[in-house]
């Protein structure tokens, strides 16, 4: 990762930027706000590309987390950063976010569930959480190997989810219905139960055969001892 990997970050509620940080100068914030106002509503993750930079957005429960990154950084690492910021933000302010009390930043239509009394205007949160954004950016920049491993892990998880969905779609594309899949499952369960019953019967049969063999051996040994005793002692008249 280059030293200029992560450039600018903010947290917004709706279209209102609540906290931001950047160690660089530029018009990143202006472009980011323009992108924010045009975010699609059907996706929780979105990336715009502009002049060798990516504007990466993560949307969660009405809150928008953004990071501007150098295009060479890729998409995985910026979203690992955004997940870290989101979890930290929720951990710090979840109680206030769930508060039903109206907040000065609330929009007319959709911002009913906002913050409590902890901060009354946007710059209070910027002053409080802006330095946290800085810490996360510095940490991610100084731990590229960890970020790379996390991004690969998330990519693998996403790939597995895609494979599972792909497999289901392939089954359905072949014309097999869910009912048939259920029937197959029930049939497999019946076969498993039948196999268990056969296994128990086989073990019982083997146990009986083993017991029979032991009784035969014991009878033979007893008969041999009895014959030796009769020969040696002359039947039942053996004297000391």
Curated annotation (Swiss-Prot):
Domain v-SNARE coiled-coil homology: 149-209
Entry membrane topology: Single-pass type IV membrane protein
Predominant place of localization: membrane
Tissue: Highly expressed in flowers. Detected in leaves, stems and roots.
SUPFAM superfamilies to which the protein is assigned, alphabetical: SNARE fusion complex, SNARE-like
Signal peptide limits: none
Topological domain ranges for the Vesicular compartment: 237-240
Sequence ranges on the Cytoplasmic membrane side: 1-215
Any Gene Ontology CC annotation: endosome
Sequence ranges assigned to domain Longin in this UniProt record: 6-133
InterPro entries tied to this protein: Longin-like_dom_sf, Longin_dom, Synaptobrevin-like, Synaptobrevin-like_transport, V_SNARE_CC
Segments crossing the lipid bilayer: 216-236
Keywords per UniProt: Endosome, Membrane, Protein transport, Transmembrane, Transmembrane helix, Transport
Superkingdom to which the source organism belongs: Eukaryota
SS bonds (residue pairs): none
Function: Involved in the targeting and/or fusion of transport vesicles to their target membrane.
Family under the similarity heading: Belongs to the synaptobrevin family.
Quaternary structure, from the entry: Interacts with subunits of the class C core vacuole/endosome tethering (CORVET) complex including VPS11, VCL1, VPS18, VPS33, VPS3 and VPS8.
PANTHER family, A to Z: SNARE PROTEINS (PTHR21136), VESICLE-ASSOCIATED MEMBRANE PROTEIN 727 (PTHR21136:SF169)
Protein name from the UniProt record: Vesicle-associated membrane protein 727
Provenance organism: Arabidopsis thaliana
Gene for this chain: VAMP727
